[in-house]
């Protein structure tokens, strides 16, 4: 009988974690580039330290990119690594200077944080200035070099190549203007959700005491709920600070992005066809009506809301636009913001308007994403070139311009464009 009871209790002990449910461990990886925002950066660290996080939640921090810090424990012109628990910076390491705007620095940080603090769930937050396609994390000690979209992608790609099972549950950008299609299209390979703002963010940024407090109170909350908490806590804190501010925060469901990307590639072919056939003035006038986020600061970002862009251009391929809209709605898990905007639907994309010459000059280094979305990338660059008075030869594959013939390959759903004698444009019967 003792042997039977002994075997029973041994089996119960082995099954107990599965039956009762083991706690979900979470590592929050904070990549914090201080620059001229270092005082706000330190305040956010103190917010994190105000939360009594449970043992299964780790906050791993890398702080750099600043000449000096308001906290005496941190060293300027160096990389500081540590974890944060209640009222404490733990295991502080001061490393030699590294450029926070370099992909290798980001990759090394992920390697350290995920290696030293393995978890069931990973949240990566990039903290600093943001500038849409120009990137994020501008290191003042490296001539304000930033992580471009390519470089964020390269860092995650390099780490994932060495650790194929690694995936982020959430990637967040506590920075201005980073809820972009361009970034989401790249991050879909590495994360489930992306949290970011279409608009500028005020200096106080995310409310870390709020959302980490929510996680500490319920470590089993889903990643989607954590992402929504980030957005809601941001809004609550910022509205309390300034009820009249322009605010936005989005949670993007990255699993739906690949379908959106494929459909936008097809839609971009229609837009390119329109450009080549006399519709440049029409598209330019439509662009002038679109609100550019960040325009009330020193310069325009030329980032426009995705639905603003789609509603303005749907005349060029109405059926394809309807499909694109339906997929886009699936991409936006949650979007919140103030009511100052005509369009605020959760994600922006870049369409040149105010900074055409700068964009053309920076295209190869900062924007060219032909390997990820070749048709849209070429449409944007071709449009900018024509807008600047230049000539551009589009090379993307387009359907034969016969009447009504069905095409194959990428554009198999596309009917070819018909033209009225005299040069008037008729939208294709898509």
Regions found by a protein language model. Name each.
Residues 27-31, 58-63, 122-126, 169-173, ...:
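Structural recognition of the beta-strand scaffold that forms the well-ordered cores
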